[in-house]
Amino acid sequence: MSVYSLKELAEHIGATSRGNTDVVVDSIAPLDKAQANQLTFISNAKFRPFLAQSQAGILVVSEADIEFCSANSNLLITKNPYVAYALLAQYMDTTPKAASDIASTAVIASSAKLGTNVSIGANAVIEDGVELGDNVVIGAGCFIGKNTKIGANTQLWANVSIYHEVQIGSDCLIQSGAVIGGDGFGYANERGQWIKIPQTGSVIIGNHVEIGACTCIDRGALDSTVIEDNVIIDNLCQIAHNVHIGTGTAVAGGVIMAGSLTVGRYCQIGGASVINGHMEICDQAIVTGMSMILRPITEPGIYSSGIPAQTNKEWRKTAALTLDIDKMNKRLKALEKKLAD
């Protein structure tokens, strides 16, 4: 197991240090559980009372946190401890790669082009015309369809399916079970019979994109579905055909986006939200969890819908009242008219 000194970690993230710069840690743990061989951090002032009692070998803190620490504590001092934690977690990460070499059971078309240091796991299928950049990692059981291109340093965990002619940028991470480039939900109806419309567009994914487990991103009907750079999409999301998601947007688990939706840059979409298609959401919009967005959002801000959980008794009363809203509205208008007369 690797160990990391206070001096090394401070230099890595550009932080200042206090205490024994030779002290070493081998992992990261929560504030209340960290031991002498571990690093921990504080990102919320409400936890300051616990700093003095921490047994951690290294504490990552802000200037404002220092007075709450023991005089003997070894400190990494930074403006944003949570960002520092993220950077240190990457530096100390022990997660194995999805594959470490090219497995003998991988099926790789002779026309596929592989960059240097590519790894492909057992039983993966790489079809004709595929291009894999340097240091790409393809996990066991993945399927990469014809003429798909995947940029350098991108990693796919086991059992990811990438259909034909998809483009994926560099430094992306795609979790197990994701399906990218499957058919969009396109049909015409003729006297009750559904007629399938072939989806001849593609999916274009930018750089530094992360896609969660079992998320589906459908290919476009004619044009492409587009996911711009630095987008993060959680597990179990449905991104329909011709959706366009702007740079830096975050999409939490279980979100459903209908076809031809355009989501702006640096938006945050809360979990289990449902968003109508053929409309736009502006840059920097925040949608809270379980919202149903049926109309365009044109101004940055926080948007919500839905009824927060209540006791069953309270909810039944609320539901009953909603049935009477129309009657109450008519009575109110009648009273207003009577008063006006």
UniProtKB/Swiss-Prot annotation:
NCBIfam families: lipid_A_lpxD, PRK00892.1. The lineage of its organism: Bacteria, Pseudomonadati, Pseudomonadota, Gammaproteobacteria, Pasteurellales. Catalyzes the N-acylation of UDP-3-O-acylglucosamine using 3-hydroxyacyl-ACP as the acyl donor. Is involved in the biosynthesis of lipid A, a phosphorylated glycolipid that anchors the lipopolysaccharide to the outer membrane of the cell. CDD domains: LbH_LpxD (cd03352). It comes from Mannheimia succiniciproducens (strain KCTC 0769BP / MBEL55E). One of its GO terms (molecular function) is N-acyltransferase activity. Belongs to the transferase hexapeptide repeat family. LpxD subfamily. The keyword Transcription regulation does not apply. Homotrimer. GO terms for cellular component: membrane. This is UDP-3-O-acylglucosamine N-acyltransferase. It catalyses: a UDP-3-O-[(3R)-3-hydroxyacyl]-alpha-D-glucosamine + a (3R)-hydroxyacyl-[ACP] = a UDP-2-N,3-O-bis[(3R)-3-hydroxyacyl]-alpha-D-glucosamine + holo-[ACP] + H(+). Pathway: Bacterial outer membrane biogenesis; LPS lipid A biosynthesis. GO terms for biological process: lipid A biosynthetic process. SUPFAM superfamilies: Trimeric LpxA-like enzymes. The keyword Nucleus does not apply.
